[in-house]
Each structure stands twice: as structure tokens, then as C-alpha cells.
Amino acid sequence: GLAPLRSVINYVRDKRENYGTVQIIYGSRSKDDLVDYQEIINEWMADDGIEVNLTIDREQEGWDGHVGFVPNYVKELNPDITKTVVMCGPPIMIKFTLGGLKELGFNETQVFTTMELRMKCAIGKCGRCNIGNKYVCKDGPVFRFDQLSELPNEY
């Protein structure tokens, strides 16, 4: 979901002079799933220098925006490869979006993702979040793509 990225987006908004234009690509299964975030999405859309791109997985009555999966939409939008990418979402979306970003020319140190879905106790005791020699709760939950590529393919 969008919640883990809200603070970083707001930080960048507050320090816009250091970051330039921000491109947000937000996908959900249906337009109804966007309702929870509609207030903050509208706030970001009203902000000069923020480009908000919304997509839903399948056509739906009353939706006139983009329809399609996030990895494909990212390729269509062809984001600036000199920028940094921060993303979160279901593991399957992350996997295919990472592949698409690499195809577009992003290098492995420009892409950050979160793996908090694997956490349970969040203090390193239960071992549920262990991937290879890393504990998501202690070593993350945010990882660069190059760090992920060093881990076993469990995510």
C-alpha cells in the first residue's frame, strides 16, 4: 500500500528544492481501493512539481483513469532514469516492477523497496523475516535492489 511511502513523499515535498519533480505511480485493484487514500492523493495532485499517476488492475464502471498493472504502467510512463525510485507493494508487483526498471536503465543502487510484509515480531526474535543472512526487521525493512539481488530468491 501507499502508507509506508507517505512520510518519504511528504519529506520530499517539504524539501522540493533538493529533489525537483516527483513522479508518483500508484496502483490498486479497483477504484474503491483508492478511497482510503483519496484525500492525500488529491493533496499531492494539487501540488506543483508532483505528478500523480493512478492505475487500477481491471476496467471498472466510473473509472476513466489508466487501467493496467503497475509494472507495465511504469514502462509506459518511462520515468527519468537519473532519479531514485522508492516503492512498496505486494511481492509480485515489486518483482516485476524491479525487472521493468532495470530494462529502462535504472541501476541497482537507485531502486529502494520495503519488505515489511515478512516481519512479525519486529525485534529479530521469531526469525520469520530471515532471508539468507539478513533479518528484515533489523537490517531493513528498506533495501536497495543491489542488496536484494545478494539474497536468496525467497521474496
What is each PLM-predicted segment?
Residues 1-120:
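FNR/FR-type flavoprotein reductase catalytic core
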